[in-house]
A protein has these predicted regions:
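Charge-rich, low-complexity N-terminal segments
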Residues: 1-109
Length: 109
């Protein structure tokens, strides 16, 4: 089994619509670190699990320097991870989103 991990850094803003008071309800930004994990039993004709540049381009185009609320209705780390997972193709089995040094979320199948 082959596994590749693509790490992508983006800057984006968002706010959360929470049922309680929180500073996260105000528009603010993060320097996200996104890790996309892909695997396959075999390599494609180019000798790769997948083309990591296509994954990076899709994520950067969707997220970098954007307001995430315009893309994802409630852009929590968890919802962002699922959205990235859905963008990343059939070889993707896990996505890890780092919002801050102390806050990470993982979505995996």
């Amino acid at each position: 089994m082959y596994t590749v991990i693509k790490t992508i850094k983006i800057s984006a803003s968002h706010y959360l619509d929470l049922k309680y008071k929180s500073k996260c309800c105000n528009l603010h930004g993060h320097n996200y670190i996104i890790k996309v994990f892909c695997r396959s039993e075999s390599l494609n004709e180019d000798g790769m699990v997948c083309d990591c540049s296509k994954i990076k381009n899709a994520i950067v185009e969707a997220f970098d320097h954007k307001e995430l609320n315009k893309l994802i209705p409630q852009p929590t780390m968890e919802n962002i991870a699922k959205y990235v997972f859905d963008l990343s193709g059939d070889k993707c089995f896990k996505v890890e989103i780092t919002e801050t040094e102390n806050n990470k979320a993982v979505y995996e199948k």
